[in-house]
Amino acid sequence: MRSVITGVAGVGKTTVLDIVARESGIPVVNYGTLMFEVAKRRGLVENRDQIRKLSRETQVDLQKLAGEEIGKMENAIVDTHMSIKTPFGYLPGLPEWVLRSINASVFVIIEADPAIIKRRRDNDPTRARDDEGVDSIREHQEMNRYFAAAYSIFSGATVKIVKNEEGKPEQAADEIVRVIK
């Protein structure tokens, strides 16, 4: 079974996914990292930031190749983005060609209270993130739901929304494990 697990920056996805991987024994594959590894093997880039500078056509090819690699995995948790917020609007994190190759059984969205997410972002000096307000974070979480519904219509996969309550990542992880096992 291949599961796609997403969440906005600061929702606690990495913490929850570490627990899910440990409890389920299913490997976590970061989609962006896999794209980078494919690009590096092909001699296209030396670091992950260079991917953004490749032509759109090359990036689409990398998306397809990474998706095909994931599609060959019997069990995998795919760590990626449901939608990507840009200055020009929201982009799909899983365009049609990626959805088709990954062939996920379930899309999981990890959510948290937008005020808590904002506080986590503000208190994380290790990341350079855009300064988004609570309303903007709320909107992005809502958009992730809309994108997940659209992906579900196309793929037939189920959609599960999991709350990551402050200080309780184990509860969120347990709920996810029940869905993906």
From Swiss-Prot:
Enzyme Commission number(s): 2.7.4.3
Q: Which reaction does it catalyse?
A: AMP + ATP = 2 ADP
> Cytoplasm: present as a keyword of the record?
yes
Main location class: cytoplasm
* Entry-linked SUPFAM superfamilies: P-loop containing nucleoside triphosphate hydrolases
Class of enzymatic activity (EC top level): transferase
A GO cellular component annotated for this chain's UniProt record is: cytoplasm
Keyword Transferase among UniProt keywords: yes
Q: Which cysteines are joined by disulfide bonds?
A: none
Instruction: Output the InterPro entries linked to this UniProt entry.
Output: Adenylate_kinase_AdkA, P-loop_NTPase
What keywords were assigned to this record?
ATP-binding, Cytoplasm, Kinase, Nucleotide-binding, Transferase
Q: Name one Pfam family in it.
A: AAA_17
Residues holding ATP: G7, V8, A9, G10, V11, G12, K13, T14, T15
Subcellular location per the Swiss-Prot or TrEMBL entry? Cytoplasm
> A Gene Ontology molecular-function term?
ATP binding
Q: Which HAMAP family match?
A: Adenylate_kinase_AdkA
Q: Which family would the database say this protein is a member of?
A: Belongs to the archaeal adenylate kinase family.
In Swiss-Prot or TrEMBL terms, this protein is called Adenylate kinase
